Structures are given as structure tokens and as C-alpha cells.
């Protein structure tokens, strides 16, 4: 049953005043809010399911809020709600004694302690639209919000709305509850509780609290609570993130125990429980600050922001938090601006924490960011939570970090398309002992990726990188089944750093171009139309990189030392098609880099050489062992193009089969100039349809 708000009955006036605003304008805006709230309460009391606002423009002001009501939908019906504001003049509702009028703050629409409440179908405009920024300090203001989910609200939504121009965030989730125990007397003792009786027993590695009361006078009545963190990171200071909860009745009689409950998960309260005790594993210091908060009623959960356009937020677009909340299928644009600060002529927030979506200050668990279009912000998604799913978003034109992970336990970043972002994904330090990030089936065009923080285990698989600047991975990263492709020629040489890569492909579509690899191990990888330059990630030590079961098509496998110590190359059980191997030294003494091809299938169709020497210091080594070499090019010149310096090359051929496929035998040269050869070994090789040189 629907209720159409009767404007005159509730003292609501349609229409927006013009600046400069007078006190009467603010008073009417405040009456509008009161009238809407009274209409919502009337509808709820009379069993209406939906309240409809007559289509029009309506003024709002701070600090009074539109308060959403449980089990009631609020249909804005295409209306516009706008906050009227003057940075340079005091509002009649500003009770502060200071003259910094631009710091007068408020929220517009609030979901607080409600369930099944839905807002949809209109435009909500914040105070930034009216602000003058005449005082340069005004750019630091970050405390007004459009719609706010708070205090355990659940199963609520904002849908099909435009929300814009608030100083903090256009939409925000606050990870608070109906009632919190923060800093309180825990009465910690070094003991345990018996699982059968709930009574204390001796222990040397568990801490238990004293008997704690469950609040009975809260509205709505609480049926659950959760253990959250405290402080900036909100990950707690518990050695174990699991704990036991023992429940008791009003006479301290034991009811039962819930074992091994994780932080940030709801804990149901037994119907007759009045008290409880907590038991913490792997703890023995009764004076330790455990940094946890008990949140009665839980934090906002299972709420949704869907099919909204969220833009022009001064600091950011959406602050996400709570548990199981979703931001899905929205356009989130031009919030927390950077390079596009000129869009509306207003200055940007004075802190680099400007973003589209942020969970940095609203810790929670199991939130979802999915199917959104995100662009035009300084940062894209900043995530700090227990676990999060970031899936199927289109994120582009981000000035700095597209996705940045703060402290978290688990993140899945899946099936996203990122384009023209300076940094695609970044990692900060995790405060969990087993943090895991799964990056799968994404497409990254341009930008770089730095995942060197080893406090996470990171899996990257089935991703595509188009024209990346660089990808650098830490020791705890795996890089499997990824595809890197270059469709244009960048201004700098791209590079990748990893311990091991598996089943990955690397390709240049246009001209053969160079990519630097700081990788020790390759398994089942494919390289096409690239100069694959191996470089030692640790220039203080000689090292070897190994290519196993890999394939090179029209490549140059480059092992060139310009400084430090060499990264020698060993290729085994692989295919080389029209690929040359270059070994070189430029002005580095006392180093002897080498490249080895072992048990490989080598096909030469267009190249004139298998090896290239580019060295001015002795010496470089080229080894071919147990390989099958098929030559189809009648113009093939020599196995080794031996460069220009005297005595700087060593060529070793052992147990190979060489075959020329032409009709007449090929006149083969081992090397182009004997004077360039330091040492040559030709042992147990077979040559078919090939004329060998008379003098080796």
C-alpha cells in the first residue's frame, strides 16, 4: 500500500530558494525535513509499505536528517533534494560559537537501527554545490554525507539515485553498532573456562574476561553481537582471531559455549542469556591491550547500493564498511578528483586520500564491489577489511592507484577491466598471519603493478596485461597462466620481476620490441616477437634463470651484461622458432655470462644465425647440447655471429642433430670469424644435408 505525501499537511514546500540564502530559507528547509520524517512515521504507523514524494525540487539543510524507517520504502519519484549552504554566512541552525561557517556539517538521509528500508528514484545534492571555498582552509572540510548506513542497519538499500557533491562521501557505511563496548574493564585473568561447566580452570596460554553484562534495554532489542577491532587498523591485537564465548543466565548459571568464533562474524545470543565471558587463545599477558570492541547488534550488514550515479564527492564517492554490504552496478565518477580538478572549477580535497570507494576507515567483512563503472578519481578502490570481493568492474582513467589493499585477510579481485590507471593494484602491510589475495581473470591496459609486500600470499592467474609499464612481484606471489601483450611501442622498456612464472604468454603485435625479465624460473611459457632480455634482480651475485618446456617464436633471447653480475640463461625441453640467442658484455670485467640450450627443438626458417655475440670483454659462452636443429633458410650464414672483438667467444656443440631441409646441402659456418673465438668444441654431433667448413 502506497502513501503519497500531502505537502501542505506536513509543512513541506516544493521549490529551491536562490542565493544569497536568508534565515527563512533554512527554516523552510528544516521544515521540509521534519515534514518528510513525520510523513514516514505516519505511513509506518498506518501499515503503508511505500511513501511517495510528489515530484519536485526540495531544499534540505544541516544538521537535521531524513531518518529512514524500518519496513518502509521511500520513493523520491524523480525529485531533487538539495542542501542549501553558505560558506561565508552563519546558518540559523549552527550553534557553534566559531566563525568558520564552512565547517558546519551534517548528513542528509540516514539509515540508523533499521531493517528492510529502501530509498530510490531521485537526486540528492550536497553542500559542495553551494560552497564558495573563499577561505582556502575550506578544502580540508570532509564531514558531510549524503546517505549514511549506520548502527546495525540491515537489508536496506539505495537504488536508482543520483547522489553528488558532499564533502566527505556521497554515500557512506559506518561500521558501528546499536551499542559498543570499547575501552572497558575486562577483568582479564590467566586461566581457561571448562567447556562443560563454564567454570575457571588453570591455563598458561589463555586469557578470560570477567563476567560481562549483555545490555537488555536497547532499542531494537539485540539478538547478536560481534567482536571487532579498535584503533586505526581495527584488526584487534589478538594473537588468534578466533575466540570462545561462554554464556550465563542472570544467576551466573552456565548456559553453553560457542567455540572458535572469528572476529567480524555475528554471534547469536541465547534467549535466556544475560551475561557472557570471552576466552582468548595463545595469550598470557593480563596487561596486554587486546584492542577489540564488542559491538552489540552487529554492524550494518546486507545493505545494497545499486544502479546509482555517485559523483563530485569532495573527498570521495562511497565509504564502504560493515559486513556483507554490496556496491553493485553503479556509475561512480569524478569523486576525489585529481587531474580532472577543472571539471567544475572547485578546488580539490587537500589530502591524497581521494577516491571512488574507500574502506580504509570502515572496517568490516565480506563486502562486495561488483559491476560498477568507476573513473575520474585520484584513487579508485581503497580496501581495508577482513575479506572483500571486487568483481567485474570497469575502472579507468584513475590518476594513481586503481585498487589498493590495506590490511586484510582475504581479497578476490576477479574479472575486472582496468584501463589507463597509473597503478593497477597495490599492496600495503597486512596485520594477519595468513593473508591471501587472489587476482584472477582481469584485464589491465597500461599502468604498472607493484605487489612486493610479502605479508600477503598473492596468486595471479589468467589475467591479461596490455602495454604494461612493469609488473613486480614479491617472494610470496605466484604468476600463472597470464598473458602480456604489446600493441604499441611505449617510450620506456617494460619489465617484470618474479621468482617463477608458469604457463604465461608474452607477445608484441607490431614490431619486435624489448622487455626486461628479472625472473629466475619459467615453466611452459610462450614468447612471441620479443627481445627477451634477462637481467639479474640481485646484481651482487651470479645467478641462473631457467626456461623449461617453453616456446620462443621470432624472438631474441638476450643475455647482456651492462653492470653487476650476470643472470646466465639455461633453456631446456623447449622450442625455439626463428629465435636468436644473444650474449654480450659491455665494459664489465671479470664476468663470464653464458646461454645454454639443452634438449630443445630449434627451427630456423628466416634467421641467419642461431647465436649473436655483442661483447667487448672476454668472454661469453654459447652451449648447444642434445638439441635437434632444423634449418630451412638457404641463406643461413653461421651458428654464431661472433661480433667484432678478438677471443671473446666460446662455442660448445655436444650431442646435437643438425638438419637442413633444402634440396641441395647447406654450406654451414660454425662462426663468422675465427679470430673472435676463444674456444670451440664440436663433440658427437650429426649433420644431415649440410656441408661442414674445412677448417673449424
Question: Where are the predicted features?
Answer:
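Extracellular ligand-binding interfaces
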Residues: 182, 199-201, 228-260
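N-terminal extracellular ligand-recognition/capping segment immediately after the signal peptide
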Residues: 33, 37, 47-105, 124
